[in-house]
């Protein structure tokens, strides 16, 4: 919303490893801001190293809301996020402070800005039928089925993503409308004035280097032990959204004996680079966003100036 009478909300978006957390902490020191995490991986407890969750020292300087709110066994939807984020925003604004939303889960930002389309509730019987078909024919065959029904959704959903794939098919079988058709119907928009920023390096190779360096740092910090603790629980599996997070899936496959350690490292870095590429694709089509260069010394100045001049 652009109405100046509405309280301001700052969005600090960007691909993974672009420097969002460091900039957010700097902003908290300069503005009356409270941070709300916009990250589908940081919601999980016990998943700290592989998600690059802010450290205890960083959280002491700048507490983050919506961290550690789910067990890895649980799911969390864009609708859940919107409900939680709106509650946190309302609380922060009521205290006379500015909500600073930080993260790279672009679907969450979209849900918050535009509202959610009226998708049908899950139907256990239809979901069971889809899973039975997958057991018989494989998810690749079901992905081909989705391709013929809803090519836009099929292009966005990987054949190895059974949760999202089955949901897209389920929506069509329940409603007779595709996921793409239904999501074009907007819900209630965000009733705040948003100042939107995206931080990323202009040089793609620099982002790739930052991703590789961070992955190796995670390994040195005990990432394998972190995932092994999850693996040894016995109630988690590779199809859960938590374990499908980049890095976790590849480490899980290594612990499961499916791939070598070196292959795990290679795949983990590649998967993270692919995530960053998807995030950048979202951001390039984003409206009303101000771009910031990773590492630039005046990024906080730009945001502060935008806030006072808006």
UniProtKB/Swiss-Prot annotation:
It holds the Pfam family IPPT. InterPro entries: Dimethylallyltransferase (IPR039657), IPT (IPR018022), P-loop_NTPase (IPR027417). The keyword Transcription regulation does not apply. The record marks 105, 127 as: Interaction with substrate tRNA. Its EC number is 2.5.1.75. ATP binds at residues 14-21. Substrate binds at residues 16-21. GO terms for molecular function: ATP binding; tRNA dimethylallyltransferase activity. Its cofactor is Mg(2+). Keywords: ATP-binding, Magnesium, Nucleotide-binding, Transferase, tRNA processing. One of its GO terms (biological process) is tRNA modification. It comes from the Bacteria. It catalyses: adenosine(37) in tRNA + dimethylallyl diphosphate = N(6)-dimethylallyladenosine(37) in tRNA + diphosphate. Residues 39-42, 163-167, 244-249 are annotated as: Interaction with substrate tRNA. Catalyzes the transfer of a dimethylallyl group onto the adenine at position 37 in tRNAs that read codons beginning with uridine, leading to the formation of N6-(dimethylallyl)adenosine (i(6)A). Belongs to the IPP transferase family. Monomer. This is tRNA dimethylallyltransferase. The gene is miaA.
